[in-house]
UniProtKB/Swiss-Prot annotation:
One of its GO terms (molecular function) is magnesium ion binding. It comes from Limosilactobacillus fermentum (strain NBRC 3956 / LMG 18251). Its EC number is 2.7.8.7. This is Holo-[acyl-carrier-protein] synthase. Its cofactor is Mg(2+). The keyword Repeat does not apply.
Length: 119
């Protein structure tokens, strides 16, 4: 049974500017595991990854119904790409499965997260 659905869109250039202006942005948004994956990426893919994780975590918080803030932070959710490149939610506060999807254009990242609960 679906417990929540969240979607989000992020501008890659906006995230790139945030990282360039405040390099600690990465530490506020990405877990150590996500930062390890990020370290393997270069050029545009580097910023797509950061924007994607930012947007996925926003979508997750919307699916949870709380938004980012008091009840869930960016670092409470870890999303790691599997060997096929699929984003997998490996750590999160919701008691049930979480499914994530991300898509990129040259300028935008679109994300969706679905939370499931048992019946």
């Amino acid at each position: 049974m679906i417990a929540g659905i969240g979607i989000d869109v992020a501008e890659i250039d906006r995230i790139k500017r945030a990282v360039e202006k405040t390099p600690s942005f990465i530490n506020k948004v990405l877990t150590k595991g996500e930062q390890a994956q990020l370290a393997t990426l270069k050029n545009q893919r580097y910023y797509e990854y950061i924007a994607g994780r930012f947007s996925l975590k926003e979508a997750y918080s919307k699916a949870l119904g709380t938004g980012i803030g008091r009840h869930v932070s960016f670092l409470d959710v870890e999303i790691i790409d599997n060997e096929l490149g699929q984003p997998v939610v490996v750590s999160h506060p919701f008691d049930g499965p979480a499914h994530a999807s991300v898509s990129h254009t040259g300028q935008l990242v679109f994300t969706e997260v679905i939370l499931e609960k048992g019946e």
